[in-house]
Structure formats: structure tokens, C-alpha cells
From Swiss-Prot:
Pfam families named in the record: UPF0102
GO molecular function annotations of the record: nucleic acid binding
Protein name per the record: UPF0102 protein Tcr_1695
Family per record: Belongs to the UPF0102 family.
Listed InterPro entries: Restrct_endonuc-II-like (IPR011335), tRNA_endonuc-like_dom_sf (IPR011856), UPF0102_YraN-like (IPR003509)
Amino acid sequence: MGWLSQKIGQQKEQQAAVWLKTQAITIVAQNFRCKGGEIDLIGLDTDDTLIFFEVKYRQSSTFGTASESVTPQKQQRLIQCAQNFLQKHPNYQACNMRFDVLFFEDNQTQPEWLQDAFWS
């Protein structure tokens, strides 16, 4: 990933975190890294559901939409990272959990929110 793409990605992740707070989501971790992957945002909603967020941005749909870029391989890496997060933070193990995707396209200031994007 080039420097500019990385910078835009970080901006969109921060934008998503701010927006999620307006949706009553408490951010418990950002950029959680583990062997083989990273989870952009991890949040807790008002009914104590732990949500693992992947944030995606696409300037154009030439190579597919932002939501289409979460491939089965990427899903597996996110699932493995989520398991690692739960091992390191056992206080969240009793929570309901889900994987959501927040995606920005073009000049959107608010993401589109795909809940229950995939299952583990």
C-alpha cells in the first residue's frame, strides 16, 4: 500500500470511529494487530454486542466496490484476529459478537454500515 493510500485509510478509520460514537458505539480498540492481520475498530454497542469493524474506502469502483474488497481470505484473517483479541481480553468473551463492514466510496463523509457482514 502506498503512502497516500495508507494516509487516506487512517483518515477514514478515524472518521468511522467518530461517526460510530454518534451511533452509540463505544470504541474499545483501534488497529488491533495480531499475527497475520489487523482489526480496524472494535466497538461495544448499547446491548453489549462486541462488534469487529473492517473499514474500507474506494475512490472508484474500477476494481470493485469497497464492500466487495472483504474477500473470504480477509474474513478468515479478521476471525483469527478476533479470536486473538478475545484471548487477550477475556472480559469480552461472554458478549454476543458480530463482524460489520463500514465502507466509504468517493467523497462520502459518512460510511455505509453493513451489519453482520459475515459469520465466523
